[in-house]
Regions:
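The feature marks the mature, well-folded catalytic cores of soluble enzymes
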Residues: 1-126
Length: 126
């Protein structure tokens, strides 16, 4: 069975993304990120998704990656807890921004996990 997405939750890029986490000590250029982000939105629209654009969060350089603090599955969302201290607080903000999209909201209160740590295959999560 295939799940058909109807909505995309996307955050506008912020200028502080240049200070985001990087394993290679890279500093992305805001102008390039903005152009790539516009193309990303166009691609989502071309496949028929409704774009739900969230405002920038300058105090959180990596907040453009909305999949890290929130894992969505059908009508459910789990607000996650990223390990890096620079991301503490993103979950509290995104839960307020997206709660109206979901029937059920759950929270990771102990331990650390972010969306990039989780793989969904059919109805199974690893």
């Amino acid at each position: 069975m295939t799940y058909r997405f109807k909505n995309a939750i996307i955050r506008k890029p912020n200028k502080s993304i240049q200070n985001g986490l990087s394993s290679q000590n890279l500093h992305p250029q805001y102008e390039i990120i903005t152009e790539e982000h516009s193309n990303y939105i166009k691609a989502m629209e071309e496949v028929g998704l409704k774009i739900n654009l969230l405002e920038t969060l300058e105090e959180y350089p990596d907040s453009i990656f909305v999949e890290d603090p929130a894992l969505t599955y059908k009508s459910n969302v789990i607000i996650l807890n990223p390990r890096d201290p620079s991301r503490n607080g993103e979950g509290d903000i995104i839960k307020e921004e997206i709660q109206h999209f979901f029937d059920n909201m759950f929270f990771v209160e102990d331990g650390f996990v972010e969306g990039g740590d989780i793989l969904n295959i059919n109805n199974h999560f690893i």
